[in-house]
Structure formats: C-alpha cells, structure tokens
C-alpha cells in the first residue's frame, strides 16, 4: 500500500501533542452522523492531542475537487491540535489498498500510528472515524496490528444524539456510507453502543426518552458521557481497549440485558429458555416476535440445527437472522453477564422498546409460543437431518453443524 507516513506525519511534526509518558496513545471516535464528529473535532481543539479526521472517498462519487484521480481513497485531515483549530488543515489522500473500506482504513491507521509513535513517543492521537464505521469490524484487527509497536490503543467512543435516537434506532433509516451500502442506522448504532468503551450522548435534556433508550442499550461497563462539556479526551486516554471483552458484549450468545431508567417509557425484556425454538412456529410467528418499533439482539437454537448458534437481531425496523458458529466456539461471557453455561444451547433474546405495553406483551407471548413444549422434546431428535423449512434463512449447509 501507499504509506501515508512520509507526507502526513511530516506535516504533523510541528503540531504539539501530549508530553512523553511512555507509549504513544491512540484513541478512536465513531458516529453515524458526520455532523456529530464535526462537533467533537471542535470540542477537542486546543486539548493535548493531535486530532485526525478520517474519511472514505470513492472514485465513483464524482465529488468535485475531491481528488486528482478516480481512485477510492482514505482521506486524512487534521484541523485540531494543542494549539487550537486551524483553518488551513493538513490533508493527505491515500489510495485504498483493498476493496474493503474498513480493511483499507485499518491498514492506513496502523501506518499513521506507527509514524506518530516515532515522531512523538509519548504523545496522543485521536482519530475521528468515517461516518458509520462499525467498531467491531475495525478495532480487533487494528489492536492486533499495533501489538508490540509502542502504540497503546486507548478507548473507543461512539457518539449519538438523544434527540434523534428513537428515530435512528427504531425506524428504518438507510445508510449510504459507501457504494452498495444496504445497512440501516439502527444496526450500526446497536453494534457500536454495545462495543464502545465510551458512549457520548448529546441532547439528553432535549429528549429524555431518547437518553433513556441509549442507557438501555449501553453496557454497564461502558462509560456514559452526557455531552461535549464532559472530559472526553481524559476518559479515552485513561482506558486501554480490550477487543475481546468488547466482542463478548455484542456476541449474540453472551450479550446481556443492561436495562436502564424507565421514567419515560423505555423498557427491556430479558427472555431466556433452555428449550429450543420450534422451526415451523418460528417461521409462522416471526412477525409477532420481531414486533414494531423495537430493538432486539440475542441467540436461539433449533432441534434441526442443534450444534449451531442461531442469531437474532431487530434494529431500525429490520429483522435479521444468521449463524454465529458452533456453541463450542462461543466466547466467555463478560463478568456477571447472564446465568447460562458457556457452550450450552439456549434461547436468549434481549428486547428494548418505548411505551406500547401491548407490543411488549406480544413479543413475550410469541417467544413462549415458539419454544418447543416439554412434551415435544421427546421427539426433538427426529428433527436432525430433516428439512426444517429455514434453509432460505440460514443455508442448508448449517443444518449439518
């Protein structure tokens, strides 16, 4: 790949960072809405760090003046340093080394971090990620690349606005972060809220229900900051990112019902059972189980696919099911998370909504109705190897696991 170190870091050399205190510190901040990252960029200006804004630019966009080539690019821009906000930013465009935008971003950030540690061993760099980057796809690999390099991967933050949280999490709002992007805002928020070390929630006073919804979807061990006046840089730099712990919080088989305030109608259901779902009843009751205007995540198992972790997610009005490997491959649950035995098949869905008690009870009833009844378990072995009618959801090959 083209190494961004020479040009970009040479321009950054005169921008002061933190006093040397050992390893170089790298923190990352993500959001779905790029306008929130603009606010964070301004808030960090004048603090003891170099702030780099990363963006993804695609040759097919036809953006005027974006580049001298038609290449897909990772763009690095820095306005902010300990000296304040500079109206004449440092900018570097790096051709994407891969067709995968997140893979390309990871490699570029690793190269920048390597150069920053050589330039300022005890300094601090904060990267504002491109909008709608999924932290779980970026950071585990970045942590591996930085291991033993003199760079400490500090905290990872996700920023969102409570005034738009209900809409972006519970309604279907499509993204267009890159060509062919078919994700919705809710799915990215749900994953990043569970994965991040720090959650920065703006607009909490303007929309208490949105603020409570964020609380319900935030892990108990993730730090919640209430706005831009909070010490974001300090919070990030005092943490060291643990990718394994973050992944375990969002794994379908080890996620937890974190809950939160209920004064403004936000609720969370924690549905769990050792019995499997009945394949035919799951198909017929999927709409009732998904509900409307809800977020849900978790796992289930089927007598027709007894060795497979089946996944369940509802976000942004869309339902998705999938396969997360075998039960033997499930990671250790976070400390204090759930009461299931690691590797033991189970159904566990965490469902969050706002108001609408009838919808909450509908989901609870659907979950109970879909489960195999105890008397049906005697014939559960008869499902193995039989077409369960869900091949279009999971694929026929996963039925053999």
Where do the PLM segments sit?
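Generic C-terminus detector
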Residues: 340-401
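C-terminal accessory "lid"/substrate-recognition subdomains
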Residues: 2-11, 57-61, 158, 164-167, ...
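Short cationic amphipathic helices and targeting signals
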Residues: 127, 199-200, 267-272, 346-354
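A structural signal for short secondary-structure junctions
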Residues: 20-21, 304-305, 341-345
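Nucleotide-state-sensitive switch-loop elements of NTP-binding domains
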Residues: 3-7, 12-15, 24-155, 162-168, ...
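A short, charged/proline- and glycine-enriched loop
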Residues: 20-26, 262-265
């Amino acid at each position: 790949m083209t190494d961004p170190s020479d040009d970009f870091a040479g321009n950054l050399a005169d921008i002061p960072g933190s006093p040397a205190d050992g390893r170089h510190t790298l923190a990352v901040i993500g959001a779905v809405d790029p306008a929130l990252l603009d606010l964070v960029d301004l808030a960090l200006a004048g603090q003891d760090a170099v702030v780099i804004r990363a963006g993804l630019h695609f040759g097919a966009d036809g953006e005027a003046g974006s580049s001298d080539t038609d290449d897909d690019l990772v763009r690095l821009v820095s306005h902010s340093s300990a000296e304040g906000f500079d109206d004449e930013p440092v900018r570097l465009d790096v051709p994407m080394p891969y067709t995968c935008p997140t893979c390309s971003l990871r490699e570029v950030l690793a190269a920048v971090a390597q150069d920053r540690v050589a330039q300022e061993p005890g300094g601090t760099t904060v990267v504002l990620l491109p909008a709608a980057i999924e932290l779980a796809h970026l950071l585990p690999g970045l942590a591996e690349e930085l291991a033993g390099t003199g760079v400490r991967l500090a905290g990872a933050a996700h920023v969102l606005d409570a005034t738009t949280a209900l809409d972006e999490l519970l309604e279907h709002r499509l993204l267009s972060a890159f060509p062919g992007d078919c994700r919705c805002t809710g799915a990215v928020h749900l994953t990043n809220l569970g994965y991040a070390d720090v959650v920065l929630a703006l607009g909490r006073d303007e929309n208490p229900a949105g603020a409570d919804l964020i609380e319900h979807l935030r892990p108990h061990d993730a730090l919640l900051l209430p706005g831009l006046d909070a010490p974001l840089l300090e919070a990030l730099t005092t943490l060291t990112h643990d990718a394994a712990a973050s992944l375990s919080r969002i794994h379908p088989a080890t996620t937890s019902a974190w809950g939160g305030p209920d004064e403004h109608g936000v609720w969370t259901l924690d549905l769990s059972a050792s019995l499997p779902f009945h394949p035919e009843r799951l198909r017929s009751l999927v709409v009732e189980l998904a509900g409307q205007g809800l977020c849900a995540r978790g796992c289930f198992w089927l007598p027709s696919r007894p060795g497979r972790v089946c996944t369940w997610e509802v976000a942004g009005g869309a339902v998705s099911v999938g396969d997360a490997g075998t039960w033997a491959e499930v990671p250790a649950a976070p400390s204090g998370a759930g009461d299931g035995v690691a590797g033991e098949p189970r159904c566990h869905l965490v469902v969050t909504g706002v108001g609408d008690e009838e919808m909450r009870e509908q989901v609870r009833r659907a979950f109970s109705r879909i489960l195999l009844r105890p008397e049906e378990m005697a014939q559960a072995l008869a499902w193995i190897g039989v077409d369960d009618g869900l091949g279009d959801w999971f694929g026929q090959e996963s039925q053999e696991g």
